[in-house]
Amino acid sequence: MNDVKQSSLFSWLLFDLANTVYAFVIPGLYFSVWLVSEQGWTDQALGFATSSAMIIVAITGPWVGARSDGSQGKKPLLFITTLACILSTFLLGTFNVNTSVLLFIISLIGFNLGSVVYDALLISVSNEKNRGKISGMGVAFGYIGSLIGFGVATYLQNIGYSYIEIFRSVAILFMIFSLPAFIFIDEKKVSSLKSNIKISESLTIVIKSWKHSRKYPGLTRFLIGRFFY
């Protein structure tokens, strides 16, 4: 890690913590409880909203990933997706329930597409020798984020905060912990990669990669499982 600034690495790790706070508290627990228990929606309707977001991510994700891999500036794209997630999370419950569900879908899309860009920044905070280790450290920080998110949300609920106030608190936590990434991460330059790729081209690449992956036993099952995870 001698060729990577510690501030750059730590900021990258903090971003994993930040988005896991969101993932654990909002889609993982509190939004579904608020929507079903307090707003009278069914689990099936919530599942449809979540599936809608995931379909959009599945279509646009390869394009975002290809653009981030080939772009010299990944942080602006990460900023846009993160801002979309934070703002829509902060506004959950502010308007009527249908608008809140739409905001929830936007937050899920922003979170998942942001994760694609975030993963592409791994090359900027690691080298070939320690990339696996750094990636594992990111996962560890993610677990810390889940504990922080659960602890803060539970505490706020116990002292009488409403679900809407918890949503806003999570959005603020996401903003605080993600901010260093936009300030301190030093991006490495990428050479000879196309950054102005079209969505149709990215889907073609995915199909070719999928066919190629079938040559490796177990890889297809792993990719399917990772997608649903």
Task: Give the role of each language-model region.
Residues G132-T154:
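Glycine-rich segments within core transmembrane alpha-helices of 12-TM secondary carriers
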Residues S68-L83:
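Cytoplasmic membrane-interface "Motif A"-like loop-to-helix N-cap segments
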Residues F79-V97:
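C-terminal ends and interior cores of transmembrane alpha-helices
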